[in-house]
Amino acid sequence: MAIISEMEEARPSMVPFTASFDPSNPIAFLEKVLDVIGKESNFLKKDTAEKEIVAAVMAAKQRLREAEKKKLEKESVKSMEVEKPKKDSLKPTELEKPKEESLMATDPMEIEKPKEEKESGPIVPNKGNGLDFEKYSWGQNLQEVTINIPMPEGTKSRSVTCEIKKNRLKVGLKGQDLIVDGEFFNSVKPDDCFWNIEDQKMISVLLTKQDQMEWWKYCVKGEPEIDTQKVEPETSKLGDLDPETRASVEKMMFDQRQKQMGLPRSDEIEKKDMLKKFMAQNPGMDFSNAKFN
């Protein structure tokens, strides 16, 4: 487990850096940044350098997803505010005046009963394919799980206690009750898990799944379960996979949905199709007494 924030607290003297950024070729800019880091520090010589860079990239992606989520929420609020004046503009008589046709109707009017409380069962996941709670939120893709925990502004890494084991996570501030403390839905790879403090006000924990072909129904034991049928894998993630791996992932997702709906999975469908072809090719054979599993 690596702690990224520790390298941020002891900062050496500042080194000037200038470079032009071409949006069509961001990798070139990153290469220049890494060249400067390699020349001006020993960071790239560390054994954990690659892992820490990957964790920083994942943290940046998480911030981008959260920004997009907030943007969508603002747009939905604006659309609701636009609709409200339209309703308010209706005159009282227009709202209260019953239609003559309804008074002449002979059939009894069907009144929709008020909806009862939400049925217990899986919950629709958030935009990150996880859930939002009062003290933290989590999201996932097939390979990783990300947990974000808001902290008081100015929080330092030395004030945080974070213990990541194969099947359990403990996170909180030293001297206080743990914020997250429980067993994972499934095991993780501790050596490929990281935590970091973003802007001194957010603990971000990155977990690498042991089984990277399964969606987690919850992050920590005791949480409500999400409906894994409603998860939305990132298109870019699937596009980055090689054809064989992508086909396996899509097959797994299809089988998972079929299983939850009580429908046949892909291998069962394939067997039935093969049997139909065989029967069609051998019309003279009698299959009436045959038993099929």
UniProtKB/Swiss-Prot annotation:
Compartmental location: Cytoplasm; Cytoplasmic granule
Residues annotated as carrying N-acetylalanine in the record are A2
Tell me which residues make up the CS domain.
131-220
Pfam families, alphabetically?
A: CS
Which InterPro entries does the annotation name?
Answer: CS_dom, HSP20-like_chaperone, NudC_fam
Which top-rank group of organisms is this from?
Eukaryota
* Region Disordered, residue ranges: 67-125
**Single GO cellular component annotation?**
cytoplasm
- Record keyword Translocase present: no
User: What keywords are annotated for this sequence in UniProt?
Assistant: Acetylation, Chaperone, Coiled coil, Cytoplasm, Developmental protein
The keyword tRNA processing is annotated on this UniProt entry? no
* Gene Ontology biological process terms in this record: response to stress
Positions the record marks as coiled coil are 50-80
What is the induction comment? Answer: Up-regulated by heat shock.
Q: Where is the composition biased (Basic and acidic residues)?
A: 67-102, 110-120
- Tell me where it mainly resides: cytoplasm
CDD domains attached here? p23_NUDC_like
Check the record and name the Gene3D superfamilies matching this protein: 2.60.40.790
Record SUPFAM superfamilies: HSP20-like chaperones
Q: What job does this protein perform?
A: Small heat shock protein required for the establishment of auxin gradients and for patterning of the apical domain of the embryo. Involved in the specification of the cotyledon primordia. Also required for normal inflorescence and floral meristem function, normal developmental patterning and thermotolerance. Acts as a molecular chaperone.
Q: What is this protein called?
A: Protein BOBBER 2
Give the organism the record lists. Answer: Arabidopsis thaliana (Mouse-ear cress)
Primary gene name? BOB2
